[in-house]
Amino acid sequence: MASTRSIELEHFEERDKRPRPGSRRGAPSSSGGSSSSGPKGNGLIPSPAHSAHCSFYRTRTLQALSSEKKAKKARFYRNGDRYFKGLVFAISSDRFRSFDALLIELTRSLSDNVNLPQGVRTIYTIDGSRKVTSLDELLEGESYVCASNEPFRKVDYTKNINPNWSVNIKGGTSRALAAASSVKSEVKESKDFIKPKLVTVIRSGVKPRKAVRILLNKKTAHSFEQVLTDITEAIKLDSGVVKRLCTLDGKQVTCLQDFFGDDDVFIACGPEKFRYAQDDFVLDHSECRVLKSSYSRSSAVKYSGSKSPGPSRRSKSPASVNGTPSSQLSTPKSTKSSSSSPTSPGSFRGLKQISAHGRSSSNVNGGPELDRCISPEGVNGNRCSESSTLLEKYKIGKVIGDGNFAVVKECIDRSTGKEFALKIIDKAKCCGKEHLIENEVSILRRVKHPNIIMLVEEMETATELFLVMELVKGGDLFDAITSSTKYTERDGSAMVYNLANALRYLHGLSIVHRDIKPENLLVCEYPDGTKSLKLGDFGLATVVEGPLYTVCGTPTYVAPEIIAETGYGLKVDIWAAGVITYILLCGFPPFRSENNLQEDLFDQILAGKLEFPAPYWDNITDSAKELISQMLQVNVEARCTAGQILSHPWVSDDASQENNMQAEVTGKLKQHFNNALPKQNSTTTGVSVIMNTALDKEGQIFCSKHCQDSGRPGMEPISPVPPSVEEIPVPGEAVPAPTPPESPTPHPPPAAPGGERAGTWRRHRD
């Protein structure tokens, strides 16, 4: 027991003995005893208190450990780059095990072909007084400059930076705070002129030149130098930073306010000397194409004529940023006179035409933003309009339809809030066939009827044609049947009334539509819950002044005299209306090919053998069958007129029944017509009708079965309105398929709160 206690005492005595700096391990004991005698000589195991872990906790506090583990935030700049805002790194022993690891990460983040191409090799303090050689020398909240092998360059790196991320800033960073504070106060005083604006910056040099778009607002435009920095990062000049910006007028941008003036396009120059040549201020075709997608909408368009160093004059209006940029700028060439006649292909009634040097920032892929004229003087000395009536009156929205030759955008009347559709036709795509578009527009300009989709307003520029059209959201004729819960013979009678009413009006103007089909009959829903049909798509319409011979239309609805090529007139529309009436009551067409062959279909149409098969027609009134028989007469003279349809008892009186035949008719429609299948959006149906142009109708001009064996009697006479579709040569191949093309469709129409009975059909009286 005594021996054990002696050993313990000696053990603690040994602990109290501190090894001297000069002492060596393994030195002989002062007692001279052997290594096996006594506890001091036989290598006793130290107390657990001397283990590595216990020593750690004895010598380093939790606070010291936490301080070592905490990441230090520091900002790093590029040597000599005054426009670089700096990059903040959180530096900790866990993230960077060595100083070299930090250099590698900085190289990855800061180095490129222009800046630090040899990577980060050296780190200086912000004032360049010394080099940093270890992680321990980096201090919290400080800023440092990264370089390769070059000497430190004295630049005020912190001029445009407000390091709000730093904590307990001391020493050199006080200058950064002072500089940032002065910039902040300067911006605060002069922010009134900053409005959201999208500008285009083109890099100087050999064409083609890169162009970028930058959004400027109160959050992105803090100072002139900061905007230059953003432009430098975006434009990436080969020579490095952007030193100066010039407008297309040749005026140098010297302050932030210059960005928010009348100019939208700027030329970016580097350290090299800028060449003030005429070519620098002229945008070539490829640059115009880039600019065409720059601006989405504009609240107003102004015109000005400031002079530029070159011979041309340029001035542009600020762009309004309220959506995805999609419209275009262009520099079209035109020789048209602004004094053209209203009905000529060169101009449209009631609209001001932009001059030959004028420019429209709209096209079929973008929103209409009518920019200023490049030249304040138009053709023949006429000056451009001071503002765009179209943009002042309407608010232009997103694209809702995109076709082969036109796009359709949302269009809202600013004064009434009423929705319309803006149809934008690209003239470049209509080259050589402008007369077809003009013919269609000239007819739309003439017609004004409650059962016809109306052309509200039109405008023409040198590159685009803008048509504000009535927007019908209720889907087409098939949608009205398939989406309803109840469909009766009386509903079909009202639909035929609306169609006949439109045809009587058109035929009174000697206009034949030639493409009457369910897809072109749109359902207009009124606030009181009532509905009516509106006829659209006048791409094949023309004025009748004599027999027509072009074989065109949709095969299922084409009249026999069109196929026979004996000459036809207005009553081909009555035949098509008769086919539609037949379909409305049973769900399938009166003439159809079992093998889906067009030649068989045409043979049946020419024969004109009309049947009302049981059981589909057992519950249909005789009055309806009588009217259909009168409408589908092969003999044109015996065929009834639109006025006679309106006066027929089945249409004008209550001869129709109220029996619900929705399920039967819908089933047959889905069986025989692809476009009768359920669709997702009723608005897109109306948009697709508006989106079509006369150029889309070329596929509907085909040869009849007699086209190969019989010569044509002659070309159709050209009406006084611009040339019609008749001038298109008849192709050699027939279109496949009697089935009409697919078109999008709607949800069921909403119930009406009052007025007439919800869901009933209006009968407009002339």
UniProtKB/Swiss-Prot annotation:
InterPro entries, per database record: Doublecortin_dom, Doublecortin_dom_sf, Kinase-like_dom_sf, Prot_kinase_dom, Protein_kinase_ATP_BS, Ser/Thr_kinase_AS
SUPFAM superfamilies linked: Doublecortin (DC) (SSF89837), Protein kinase-like (PK-like) (SSF56112)
Residues of the active site: 515
Disulphide connectivity of cysteines: none
UniProt-annotated binding residues for ATP: 400-408, 423
Residue stretches of biased makeup (Pro residues): 737-752
Keywords: ATP-binding, Cytoplasm, Cytoskeleton, Kinase, Nucleotide-binding, Phosphoprotein, Repeat, Serine/threonine-protein kinase, Transferase
Cellular compartments per GO CC: cytoplasm; cytoskeleton
Residues covered by the Doublecortin domain: 72-158, 197-280
GO BP of this protein: hippocampus development; intracellular signal transduction; microtubule cytoskeleton organization; negative regulation of protein localization to nucleus; protein localization to nucleus; pyramidal neuron development
Signal peptide (from-to): none
EC number: 2.7.11.1
MF terms in GO: ATP binding; microtubule binding; protein serine kinase activity; protein serine/threonine kinase activity
Modifications the protein undergoes after translation, according to the UniProt entry: Autophosphorylated.
Region (Disordered): 1-45, 300-378, 707-766
Domain of life: Eukaryota
Keyword Magnesium found: no
Compositionally biased intervals (Low complexity): 24-39, 300-312, 324-347, 724-736
Residues with PTM Phosphoserine: 362, 647
Main location: cytoplasm
Function statement: Protein kinase with a significantly reduced C(a2+)/CAM affinity and dependence compared to other members of the CaMK family. May play a role in the down-regulation of CRE-dependent gene activation probably by phosphorylation of the CREB coactivator CRTC2/TORC2 and the resulting retention of TORC2 in the cytoplasm.
Complexes and interactors: Binds to and stabilizes microtubules. Interacts with MAPK8IP1/JIP-1, MAPK8IP2/JIP-2, MAPK9/JNK2, PPP1R9B/NEURABIN-2 and actin.
Comment field on protein domains: The doublecortin domains are involved in the colocalization with microtubules.
UniProt similarity note: Belongs to the protein kinase superfamily. CAMK Ser/Thr protein kinase family. CaMK subfamily.
Protein name (database record): Serine/threonine-protein kinase DCLK2
Source organism: Homo sapiens (Human)
Lineage, opening ranks: Eukaryota, Metazoa, Chordata, Craniata, Vertebrata
